[in-house]
Amino acid sequence: MNENIKLTEQEIIRREKLKKYEDLGVETFKKFDHEKINIYSNEINQKYSNLTKDELLEKQIKLIVAGRILTQRGPFIVIQDTNGKIQLYIDKKELEERKETLALLDIGDIIYVKGTLMKTMKGELTIKVNFFDLLTKGLTPLAEKYHGLVDVEERYRKRYLDLISNPNIKEIFWTRTKIISKIREFFDKQNFMEVETPMLHSILGGASARPFKTYHNSLSSSFNLRIATELPLKKLLVGGIDRVYEIGRIFRNEGIDTTHNPEFTSIEFYQAYSNLEIMMEQTENLIKFIAKELGLSKIKNHDVEIDLLADFKKINMVDAVSEATKVDFRNIDLNKAIEIAKSYKIKVEKYFKVGHIINELFELLIEKTLIQPTFVMGYPIEVSPLAACSKDKRFTERAELFINTKEYANMFTELNDPLDQRRRFEAQFEEKESGNEEASEIDEDFLNALEYGLPPAGGCGIGIDRLVMLLTQKESIREVILFPTLKKKQL
């Protein structure tokens, strides 16, 4: 044992019990070699809660369960399995030969139980135990019984304890699982193909973000962890897979806050022979489908109710900014735009053009007002290097979906002109040379793919973590990621 580890009194007592188990010939960390579990806690209540005490006595229902001990009170023990809690009744007279091992049980131990279902005088479903076995001895006590694990940072750092101590946490992640399942169902019904594309990219692309860098020893090559799945998915459109999607991890070497984690989960989907309007329709239908299927159509934002089944609004970015600033940003030169930006205390980078400033003003003035589901359309070309232009070439056929002031989806009519795409990449490269670390690089392989012909298409990316936040009404992305990225703990 590491002599630097200081044990608490309870931890010392539990380790002493290991020796007592050993003296009794009882293994404390077993392989599972028993008859299979035949029921879980939620099924017990669903199947048998309507039976009376006498009916249960007559039927003699035999159950096999396992779980972690949460409480011990006289002859009653409550264990927790994956779906909830089960009460056990132990008559020590009937388990005389196991009385010594029974006496060594602690809260946190994992046990295996066979028994007969009964009801107590209070009408609680309970398993009367006729066989039990210790499967795993808990050497460290669980969080304090009545308060659970309340330190927020510690909850994220020790999610395993959080799941044991706070039953509602597990519900969040069941909801997350259901949301992802419904996303797949939505696209599978439309004959989309789910694919997996590389996480190691030699060229950055598909988004504006700083990457995590790594190195492949055998290839003697530097790689980036992907910041988006867009470019490989569009190559698949070129290859004739007309409907494609990917659910996967994305990595961005950026700040951490309530809506950003360096690694997160997204879905990107692409559809040939479609456009921005179809992408907005698909996105709205997807969110409504999930909300309806999960019974989560009404979301509370403090005193405001957000109705996910109502028609989503549509606004134009430049019009919204013009209205908020009382300045016509469709007809403005760069010097005037810079002057206005500085009046709002916006830091103007040397590579900024009018489009950058429109986007900055939108983020400052408009985003915070978007509570009900709203598509914001008409993004400037400077911040949309992969989107097709609108009739006014300064803007693109791009939209983002905002709900409760946060961005949930980014979609556009895909740019399929390889010559224009090269010009956009070159403009991005100039921005990178001028200090924009998030600008895209020139991806020659992607440009080559476009030269073979990308059909007219629409594409969309949705942050799944934020969607889970919305539907579970959580304020922090850390609440919906099992193991969020945390600062190293100071010892």
Swiss-Prot record:
It is an enzyme of class 6 (ligase). Pfam families: tRNA-synt_2, tRNA_anti-codon. Its main location: cytoplasm. Its EC number is 6.1.1.6. One of its GO terms (biological process) is lysyl-tRNA aminoacylation. Binds 3 Mg(2+) ions per subunit. CDD domains: LysRS_core, LysRS_N. Mg(2+) 1 binds at residues 400, 407. It comes from the Bacteria. Its cofactor is Mg(2+). Belongs to the class-II aminoacyl-tRNA synthetase family. PANTHER family: LYSINE--TRNA LIGASE, CHLOROPLASTIC_MITOCHONDRIAL, LYSYL-TRNA SYNTHETASE. This is Lysine--tRNA ligase 2. It comes from Mycoplasmopsis pulmonis (strain UAB CTIP).
